């Protein structure tokens, strides 16, 4: 179990979680405010 918790705290897992959160936030912003570059 210690190895599993050590794996969850590594940098790639944190990067995957953070990047998936940022991409989901960007997709939701584009869903509610489409074509934001035309403003």
From Swiss-Prot:
Keywords from the named record: Membrane, Photosynthesis, Photosystem I, Thylakoid, Transmembrane, Transmembrane helix
Pfam name, any one: PSI_PsaJ
InterPro entries referenced in this protein's UniProt entry, alphabetically: PSI_PsaJ, PSI_PsaJ_sf
Keyword Thylakoid listed: yes
Transmembrane segment boundaries: 7-27
Stated role: May help in the organization of the PsaE and PsaF subunits.
Similarity remark: Belongs to the PsaJ family.
Protein name: Photosystem I reaction center subunit IX
């Amino acid at each position: 179990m210690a190895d599993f918790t050590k794996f969850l705290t590594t940098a790639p897992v944190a990067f995957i979680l953070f990047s998936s959160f940022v991409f989901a936030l960007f997709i939701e912003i584009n869903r509610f405010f489409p074509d934001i570059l035309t403003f």
